[in-house]
A protein has these predicted regions:
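Charge-dense, helix-prone N-terminal extensions
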Residues: 1-133
Length: 133
């Protein structure tokens, strides 16, 4: 099995969160950490240098390379909080319409703040990602 640049590490999640300079981003990260852990029942792990991931599964690319990745995760970036899900979030038109202020990628949500969204809708998205694999 090959190793990704953003592979699971043994780094401390609490130290990672405490090192976030932006206090609002730190508070949102602590809240999101608690929410995802409660939904998934899984311990958080640092993946790469800046992703907090929950759960783990193996997948194989079309070229045959096999990797491990997390079921759901987040990254507290400077511009936004990114929530990673393991399915095409753009297929969730009904949930996204109710979520609040956000942007999307194929497998991620970009949030400025948890205060801008409906947390219960986010919880449904997180739960679906956790069950996806």
């Amino acid at each position: 099995m090959k190793t990704l640049v953003n592979a699971e590490t043994n780094k401390s999640v609490s130290e990672f969160i405490e090192a976030i300079a932006n206090q609002k981003r730190k508070a949102d990260s602590k809240e999101l950490l608690e929410i995802i852990q409660k939904i998934t029942g899984k311990e958080p792990k640092i993946w790469g240098v800046g992703i907090v991931g929950f759960g783990k599964y193996s997948y194989q690319r079309k070229n045959g390379d096999e990797f491990e990745w997390f079921n759901v995760g987040f990254s507290p970036g400077k511009a936004h909080l990114t929530v990673y899900v393991m399915y095409d979030i753009n297929e969730e038109k009904d949930l996204l319409a109710k979520l609040g202020k956000h942007k999307t990628g194929r497998g991620c949500l970009y949030l400025k703040s948890l205060a801008d969204i409906d947390i219960n809708v986010l919880k449904k998205i997180i739960a679906k990602s956790d069950r996806w694999r």
